[in-house]
Amino acid sequence: MSSLATTAGAVTTLADMVPRHDRVLPVDEALASLFPAAGLQRGHVIGCSGSAATSLALAVVARAATAGAWVAAVGMPTLGVEAAAEAGVPLARLVLVDIDESQPAASWAERVGAAADGFEIILTRPPHGAERMLRKVQQRLQARGVVLVAVSDAANDVASRQGRLACDVELATFTVEWLGIGTGHGGLVGRRVSVTSNGRRSPRPLRAELWLPGPEGRPGRVG
């Protein structure tokens, strides 16, 4: 925990150089139509679920990180830095934070709270058992103006975990097709994903067809 506190302190100093008056952090133009404000509003919770949840979450934070925002990935041990880089996230702006698996819920809440002091975006997968802590965590993030991007691979898990986070925007993904698979051979070069955006900040469902990733390796709009 001390290492995270040191990192957060250093990041806070650097983050002071980034204007905080801008209430909306940028997203890639391919994703902008999925957000009511065409970007990430500070203090909001974004839920990503379904077959391409992690890929979408990385795409969501990439543009803001490129623009200078710091991203903490808390409790996501399977998140690969190579995948993050391929999604466009500058690794110099990404810090991976482990949680104590012997007491995951308490450790998760503690690490997220500490990260809120120095990071503008927190990417995380809330562990089972954290439900009773979610409201307090969310209130702290809102007070700090931190964007929380919560990931769930199961589409129906968004209601049980992310739903209790009171997501401002919920992005559900469904893989439509993979590109590059021949007749029993060939490498995968792209994935077409259908994304639906709902949430308490969305007056109506919003939909988009995206490449996650596209043939060039980066996210993009289909068509």
Roles of regions detected by a PLM:
Residues 70-139:
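Long, charge-dense
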